[in-house]
Design a protein with these regions (language model features):
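Conserved ATP-driven helicase/translocase motor core recognized via long
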Residues: 1-145, 592-605
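Conserved motor-region signature of P-loop NTPase helicases/translocases
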Residues: 3, 7, 11, 15, ...
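Conserved helicase/translocase P-loop NTPase motor core
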Residues: 45, 125-178, 190-194, 325-328, ...
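Active-site-adjacent bridging/hinge elements
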Residues: 107, 126-130, 203-209, 488, ...
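Short glycine/proline-rich turn/loop motifs
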Residues: 109-116, 132-138, 142, 247, ...
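Metal-dependent DNA phosphodiester-chemistry modules and their immediately adjacent helices/loops
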Residues: 385-423, 543
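C-terminal accessory regions
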Residues: 418-433, 443, 491-495, 547-604
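Conserved catalytic motifs of ABC-family nucleotide-binding domains
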Residues: 523-564
Length: 605
């Protein structure tokens, strides 16, 4: 969700100039003064009540909520309902007057101050984006350049209405007789607005147009894809914005997946989408009727800890899920499948990387019946390679002989006992690349290792046009290069690991989905929203979802719409993952609790 609404952000930021920023900053300064005054007054109310309680032998904690005792009130965590004084304070003769004054003051100023805080608290993020956008435009003007990703925006500015179709569109429409657009569920509203007039011109000239897509496979909203365009077209809703008259046809035959998996997906997703107000067409299985294997493994930390007597009780759900996933791989290997027949699909790249390292450790330890030989274009970080670590720690020790961590790793982990000879290395008279090549030669680093080769390639790019200073490179390694991935090409009899996004359109005999317990609504990251306030110069603002529930109806509707779209996004991801297998589907996740959070009958995770 960190990348949601990029088009909105880009559009608004691109229209804000330096003079506009001055107005915005002036509004922000005034608004935040009001917020601070509101917080100050609430804290004064709290301290006054506590003083009255102390003077009259009353226990202040009986009348003030613990979260704000001692005047700890902040608008950041404040809710629409006043939770400062407890109702008991209103019934105490000494406190009732103060209780009424506080509630009246809170009710009068809370909503206004909460709005101001949400709009202006992160104003410097907006200023930074505006500065970057203006600097980008200056650089493009200097180079007489144009970014290809801005093409849609440029066309959008030209195509202002149906009555003003540009000359080139008329010419193209008269020549193209048939138009087909595939994967239409990932089309952005901006792109569709540009194409729509071309399609209308084509149809008016006697041609034909067809769009293909599946709203259930729309998983690129973070890249401005909007499944609602396809849904409106399929429903024949020509009155909706950006729509035209259509005839919808469902292609329901499934020739990929065994019947039992198709039937399961029909039952699961028809109910799940129905709860979101979306009716979907069920698929008709055309392959291996009565066949197909579905497996679910649930992990429970509490149960597992109690059953493993004598072991440490610091088990994590992630550890158990990795063990359970490995057991699923073993199950299929024991039943005649090869590693080449399988794929592991992950919602998050971080989980993919963690599991890839786990499998590598299993292979290196040699304690299991099978070798897993994991491969992925997304999993393996440079910093995870022992050979690369050796190079980097040697560089660190050369740069600073007092680096005890580097010294310990080289001596105890890598088993290098002759660190004194590193004193002979003269970094002032040799380039960084030559220094690394000498390290590879002198310390028996495997020069053919794929990680070492990737490290050398990235080092060469770094050194091109930059300082060869060792300290600068170590900073670059810590900040950036250590997090870069290495593509491990698929070899014969290797296990492929992918994110769900990368697996779209592909098929596999066996699909295993570890960590299948992600949140359907993400409250961890801020989302950029358009400002609903007419008098504000701020066009957009970032906010978490929860605070928006605590303002008024306009903000409530805004956040409910975002939560709804996130549920659809994550359900679509689940659908894409569950429809990749041909014969077998395995799901691994933590055991859901009885009181799992849900909203409108739909689970949060």
């Amino acid at each position: 969700s960190k990348e949601l609404n990029k088009a909105i952000v880009s559009d608004v930021v691109g229209k804000i100039g330096i003079e506009d920023l001055k107005v915005i900053l002036s509004q922000a300064d005034e608004a935040m003064r009001e917020v601070r005054e509101f917080e100050k007054q609430i804290r004064t109310f709290i301290r006054t009540l506590e003083e009255i309680c102390n003077e009259n032998g009353l226990n202040a904690s009986s009348y003030v909520y613990a979260a704000v005792s001692g005047g700890k009130f902040s608008i950041t965590n404040a809710e629409k309902k006043c939770r400062i004084f407890k109702n008991k304070a209103g019934k105490e003769e000494l406190l009732s007057g103060l209780y009424e004054k506080l509630n009246h003051y809170y009710e009068r100023y809370y909503v206004k101050c909460k709005k101001s805080y949400l709009l202006y608290n992160s104003i410097y993020k907006l200023c930074l984006l505006v500065f970057i956008a203006n600097r980008k435009q200056d650089l493009l003007k200097e180079d007489n350049g144009f970014l290809l990703r801005d093409t849609q925006k440029l066309l959008n500015a030209m195509v202002t209405s149906e009555d003003v179709v540009p000359f080139i569109y008329e010419k193209i429409g008269s020549r193209i007789r048939n138009i087909m657009i595939d994967e239409f569920q990932d089309t952005s509203s901006q792109a569709w607005y540009n194409f729509m007039f071309l399609l209308k011109e084509c149809l008016a000239s006697g041609g034909s147009c067809a769009v293909f897509g599946d709203v259930k496979q729309s998983i690129y909203r973070w890249n401005d894809g909007d499944w609602r365009i396809l849904k409106d077209l399929y429903d024949g809703n020509a009155k909706k914005k950006y729509s035209i008259s259509t005839i919808g046809k469902s292609l329901s035959d499934n020739y990929r997946t065994d019947a039992e998996i198709v039937n399961f997906n029909n039952d699961l997703f028809s109910q799940a989408f129905k709860r979101l107000g979306i009716d979907i067409d069920k698929q008709t299985p055309k392959r291996n009727i009565g066949k197909g294997e579905l497996r679910f493994r649930f992990t429970n930390t509490t149960k597992e800890t109690s059953e493993r007597e004598g072991e440490k009780s610091n088990l994590k759900n992630s550890d158990l899920e990795m063990e359970a996933t490995r057991a699923e791989i073993d199950y299929y290997l024991d039943n005649g499948y090869e590693l080449d027949d399988m794929v592991l699909l992950f919602r998050h790249k971080s989980k993919l990387q963690m599991f890839a390292e786990y499998l590598k450790e299993c292979d290196n330890a040699g304690l299991h019946d099978h070798k897993y030989n994991p491969c992925s274009n997304e999993a393996f970080l440079l910093k995870t390679s022992e050979e690369v670590k050796k190079i980097v720690f040697i560089l660190r020790f050369i740069a600073d002989k007092k680096d005890t961590i580097a010294k310990y790793w080289l001596e105890k982990i890598a088993g290098i006992g002759e660190l004194d000879k590193l004193n002979e290395y003269k970094t002032e008279t040799v380039s960084l690349i030559d220094l690394v090549l000498r390290i590879i030669k002198d310390f028996d680093v495997n020069a053919q290792d794929v990680f070492v080769l990737a490290f050398c390639d990235k080092l060469a790019k770094y050194c091109s046009g930059r300082s060869n200073g060792l300290d600068d490179f170590i900073r670059h390694w810590n900040d950036t290069m250590s997090q870069e991935t290495v593509i491990i090409s698929k070899e014969k009899n290797s296990l492929e690991l992918q994110t769900i996004h990368k697996s779209k359109g592909l098929e596999y005999d066996v699909v295993i989905i570890p960590f299948c317990d992600w949140f359907f609504v993400d409250n961890r990251h801020d989302v950029w929203f358009e400002t609903p306030e007419k008098g504000s110069a701020v066009g957009i603002f970032p906010s978490g979802l929860k605070p928006l529930h605590e303002v008024d109806d306009k903000y409530e509707q805004m956040v409910e719409q975002e939560e709804y779209l996130q549920r659809v996004d994550n359900l679509n991801l689940l659908y894409v993952a569950f429809t990749r297998p041909k014969h077998c589907l395995s799901v691994v996740c933590k055991e859901p609790t009885v009181n799992e959070n849900s909203k409108n009958g739909f689970p949060q995770s």
